[in-house]
C-alpha cells in the first residue's frame, strides 16, 4: 500500500499550492531558526535533517509555515495583472516549500516513530491544518484566477502537461467547495475541520490497540512455529521486558505466520480475535461511533456540492468514472472468488477430518489448514520456501530488476553520510548506470518496532521537477519485517517478498519521474497501484530465482523442483486472497454509496456481508473498525476497489511481457513501459497512457486467467 502519511491535508492541497514533496527552494522559503522549516543542506541537493527532529518545534513550525503560505497565496490571488498560466498556475507551484519539508518530518513522526506525545500534538494540529486547507480552497479570488486560465484562450496554446496541470488545479478548487457561498461555505469548512480530527483519532485508536495487545507464550506453546518466527518472537519479548517468553504482537506481520503454523488452536483463535477486534473492543478506543460520524459528515459535505453520495463525487475524476463501473468489475469477479472459497474449505475440512481433528473449519483455522492442503496437494511447504527468501538478497534482486528495466544502479551510502531518523534505516544513492547521472536517494526502514504503524508503504520526501531547476528524488520504502536475533538473516514469507517488490514499485515510479511541475507527481488512485502491482511479477522471473533466491545457510540456489511446485501452486488459495480483499472493497463502496443517517457500523457490516453470501470461514481483510485505508483519511475512501482496477491493467501488461521476444526483460517493451507508464506520472490521463503502451485498453480476461477463475464472456 502506498501511503505517504502527510495526512489528507497534504494529499488534497497538492493540487492547489501545497508542495508536499519537501523540495528545497531558496526563493519561496521562510526566514526561520526552526530546524523543521529550514532549507535542507548537505549533499545530493540537500536532505532532511532527521537527526535534528525536535517535537517541541512542530507546532510553532506549522503555525509559521501555514501563515507564510497563506500570505504567498494571497499575493497570487490579489495580483492585479490579468491571470495567466505563468502568474497563477506556475506561481502556485512555487508556494509551500517550507510546509512541504515540514510534512516530511510530520510523516515520520506519524508513521515511523510515533509517541503518545506526538499523537497528542497531532490531534491538536489536525483541525488547524483543515482550516488552513479550507482557507485556500475557499479563496474566491484565487479560484477566479484559476478558472480564468482554465476557461481562457491561453489554455489551448499550452503544452499537454501544462493543460493537465491547469485541469488539476481547477478541479482542486471546484471539487472542494470553492463555489459555495454563505452558510454552505461555512458548513463545508466546519465539516472538514471535524473530519480531520476524527480521522486522526480513528488512526490513533487502531495504533493503540496494536501496541496495547501483545500475547506472551512459553516454550510449551511453540509447536509448529518456524525457528525464524520463534527467534524473532523471543527478541520482541525481551524488548518488552518479558525475557524467557515469546511475544506475538498485534500486527499482520506477526499474526499471519502464527495463524499459518501454530498447532495450538486455542491460541490461534485468541490471536485471530485480538487482531480482527482492533478498534472494536467497546472501550475508549472503539471506532464504531467514529465511523458513523465520518460517513455522515462526508455524505453531508458532498451533498453541499450537488452530488448524490460520496462515491459519486470520489470517482468522478478517477479511471472508473462512476461507482457503477467499479461495482461491475468487482461483482464480475466475486462469484468465482466465493465459489473457489467453498472448494478450498472443503479441501481443508477433508484434511482436518482425516487427521481426526474433530473440528469445523473456522476463520482462525483457514491459514493453518490451507498450508496443510498446499503441502499435501503440491508438496509445497511455505516454510521451506522461506529458507530461500532472505531480506537482503531480495533487496539485491530488486536492484537487479531496476537496473535491467530502468537502467538504475543503487550504491549504498556509508552510515552518517546523510541523516536518518532511526538506526534501522539505510540509504542508497540511485544513479543512471549508463551516464552516471545522479537520480536520487532511496531510504529503507525495514523492521517493525513500537511506535511504527503496521503494514508496508512508500513515500517521497522530495519529488522530481525541472521548472525552476532540476530537483532530484528522495524516496523511501517502509516495512514491518520481524527483526531476527543479532547476526541472523531475516527470512520472509512469499507474500511478504511480493509486498517488498510491490512497494519498491512505488519507489521506482517516483525515481523514474521526468515531469516538469511537482504537482504532476501526484496520481489517480485507481491507477497508482498498477505500477507497484506490476513490479511484483519480476519476483518470479528466472533471473531473480536463479541468482537471488538462495538458501540462507548453504548459499545454494532454490531447487528447480521447488520452483516448479511454486509455479504449480500459483493460483492456490486465490479464493481466500480475492474474497478477503473484495469484501473490504465492496463494503467500502457501499458505505459511501448510501445515506448513512442512523448508521450502525457493526450492523451494516454484518448485513452487507450477509447479502454478499460472504463465506463464514473468512473475514474481511480490513474490518470496519480498523479499516485505516478509508477511515483514517480519505485517500482510499470509496477507492479501495482501485487495487483490483489496477490489477486488470497489471495482468494485461504482464501478458504483454510474457508474449515479448525478450520476455520480462525485453528491452524495447521495458523502455515503452518506463516512458509511457512510469516516467510521465500524472502528466497524462492514465487511460491514454495505457493505450500508448499496449495499443488498446486493458481487458479483464487476463485478470481472471491470473487467478485461475473462469473468463467471463
Question: Where do the protein language model's features map onto the residues?
Answer:
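N-terminal helix-rich structural modules
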Residues: 27-227, 663-665
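Bacterial N-terminal signal peptides
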Residues: 8-17
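Catalytic Zn2+-binding segment of zinc metalloproteases
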Residues: 308, 505-517
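C-terminal, non-catalytic "cap/extension" segments appended to globular domains
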Residues: 24, 28-57, 64, 224, ...
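Active-site-proximal, well-structured secondary-structure segments within enzyme catalytic domains
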Residues: 161, 165, 197, 204, ...
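Short pre-active-site segment immediately N-terminal to the catalytic Zn-binding motif
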Residues: 482-501
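Short His/Asp/Glu-rich catalytic/ion-coordination signatures at enzyme active sites or charged loops
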Residues: 42-57, 106-125, 148-190, 249-289, ...
Amino acid at each position: 500500500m502506498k501511503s505517504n502519511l502527510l495526512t489528507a491535508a497534504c494529499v488534497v492541497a497538492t493540487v492547489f499550492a501545497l508542495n508536499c514533496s519537501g523540495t528545497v527552494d531558496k526563493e519561496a522559503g521562510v526566514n526561520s531558526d526552526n530546524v523543521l522549516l529550514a532549507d535542507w543542506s548537505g549533499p545530493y541537493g540537500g536532505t532532511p535533517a532527521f537527526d535534528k527532529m525536535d517535537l517541541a518545534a512542530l507546532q510553532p513550525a506549522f503555525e509559521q509555515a501555514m501563515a507564510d503560505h497563506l500570505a504567498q497565496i494571497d499575493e497570487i490571488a490579489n495580483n492585479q495583472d490579468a491571470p495567466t498560466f505563468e502568474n497563477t498556475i506556475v506561481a502556485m507551484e512555487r508556494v509551500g516549500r517550507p510546509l512541504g519539508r515540514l510534512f516530511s518530518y510530520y510523516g515520520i513522526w506519524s508513521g515511523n516513530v510515533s509517541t503518545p506525545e506526538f499523537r497528542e500534538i497531532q490531534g491538536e494540529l489536525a483541525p488547524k491544518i483543515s482550516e488552513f486547507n479550507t482557507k485556500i480552497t475557499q479563496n474566491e479570488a484565487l479560484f477566479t484566477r484559476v478558472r480564468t486560465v482554465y476557461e481562457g484562450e491561453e489554455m489551448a496554446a499550452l503544452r499537454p502537461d501544462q493543460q493537465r496541470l491547469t485541469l488539476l488545479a481547477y478541479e482542486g478548487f471546484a471539487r472542494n467547495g470553492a463555489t459555495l457561498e454563505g452558510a454552505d461555505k461555512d458548513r463545508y469548512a466546519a465539516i472538514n475541520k471535524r473530519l480531520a480530527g476524527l480521522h486522526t483519532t480513528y488512526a490513533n485508536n487502531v495504533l493503540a490497540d496494536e501496541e496495547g495487545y501483545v500475547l506472551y507464550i512459553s516454550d510449551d506453546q511453540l509447536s509448529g512455529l518456524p525457528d525464524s518466527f520463534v527467534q524473532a518472537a523471543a527478541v520482541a519479548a525481551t524488548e518488552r521486558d518479558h525475557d524467557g517468553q515469546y511475544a506475538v504482537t498485534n500486527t499482520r506481520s506477526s499474526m499471519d505466520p502464527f495463524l499459518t503454523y501454530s498447532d495450538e488452536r486455542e491460541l490461534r483463535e485468541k490471536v485471530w480475535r485480538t487482531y480482527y477486534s482492533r478498534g472494536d473492543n467497546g472501550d475508549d478506543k472503539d471506532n464504531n461511533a467514529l465511523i458513523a460520524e465520518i460517513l455522515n459528515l462526508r455524505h453531508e459535505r458532498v451533498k453541499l456540492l450537488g452530488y448524490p453520495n460520496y462515491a459519486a463525487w470520489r470517482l468522478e475524476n478517477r479511471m472508473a468514472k462512476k461507482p457503477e463501473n467499479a461495482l461491475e468489475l468487482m461483482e464480475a469477479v466475486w462469484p468465482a472468488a466465493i465459489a473457489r472459497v467453498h472448494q478450498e474449505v472443503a479441501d481443508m475440512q477433508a484434511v482436518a477430518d482425516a487427521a481426526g481433528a474433530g473440528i469445523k473449519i473456522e476463520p482462525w483455522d483457514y491459514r493453518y489448514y490451507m498450508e496443510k492442503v498446499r503441502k499435501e496437494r503440491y508438496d509445497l511447504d511455505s516454510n521451506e520456501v522461506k529458507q530461500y527468501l532472505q531480506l537482503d538478497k531480495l533487496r539485491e534482486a530488486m536492484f537487479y530488476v531496476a537496473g535491467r528495466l530502468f537502467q538504475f544502479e543503487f550504491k549504498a551510502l556509508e552510515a552518517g553520510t546523510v541523516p536518518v531518523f532511526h538506526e534501522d534505516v539505510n540509504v542508497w544513492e540511485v544513479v543512471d548506470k549508463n551516464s552516471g547521472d545522479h537520480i536520487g536517494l532511496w531510504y529503507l526502514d525495514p523492521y517493525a518496532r513500537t511506535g511504527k504503524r503496521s503494514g508496508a508503504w512508500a513515500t517521497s520526501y522530495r519529488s522530481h521537477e525541472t521548472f525552476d531547476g532540476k530537483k532530484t528524488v528522495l524516496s523511501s520504502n517502509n516495512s514491518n519485517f520481524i527483526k531476527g536475533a543479532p547476526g541472523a538473516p531475516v527470512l520472509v514469507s512469499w507474500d511478504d517478498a511480493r509486498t517488498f517488490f510491490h512497494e519498491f514499485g512505488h519507489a521506482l515510479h517516483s525515481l523514474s519521474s521526468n515531469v516538469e511541475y511537482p504537482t504532476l507527481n501526484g496520481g489517480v488512485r485507481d491507477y497508482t497501484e498498477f505500477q507497484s502491482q506490476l513490479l511484483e511479477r519480476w519476483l518470479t522471473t528466472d533471473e531473480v530465482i536463479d541468482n537471488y533466491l538462495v538458501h540462507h545457510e548453504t548459499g545454494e540456489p532454490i531447487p528447480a523442483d521447488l520452483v516448479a511446485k511454486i509455479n504449480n501452486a500459483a493460483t492456490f488459495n486465490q479464493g481466500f486472497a480475492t474474497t478477503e480483499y473484495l469484501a473490504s472493497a465492496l463494503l467500502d463502496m457501499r458505505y459511501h454509496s448510501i445515506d448513512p443517517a442512523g448508521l450502525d457500523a457493526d450492523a451494516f457490516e454484518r448485513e452487507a456481508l450477509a447479502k454478499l453470501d460472504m463465506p463464514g470461514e473468512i473475514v474481511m481483510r480490513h474490518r470496519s473498525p480498523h479499516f485505516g485505508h478509508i477511515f483514517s483519511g480519505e485517500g482510499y475512501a470509496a477507492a479501495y476497489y482501485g487495487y483490483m482496477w489496477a490489477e486488470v491493467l497489471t495482468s494485461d501488461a504482464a501478458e504483454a511481457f510474457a508474449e515479448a521476444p525478450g520476455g520480462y526483460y525485453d528491452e524495447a517493451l521495458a523502455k515503452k513501459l518506463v516512458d509511457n507508464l512510469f516516467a510521465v506520472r500524472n502528466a497524462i490521463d492514465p487511460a491514454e497512457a495505457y493505450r500508448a503502451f499496449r495499443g488498446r485498453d486493458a481487458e479483464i480476461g487476463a485478470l481472471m486467467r491470473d487467478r485461475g477463475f473462469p473468463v467471463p464472456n
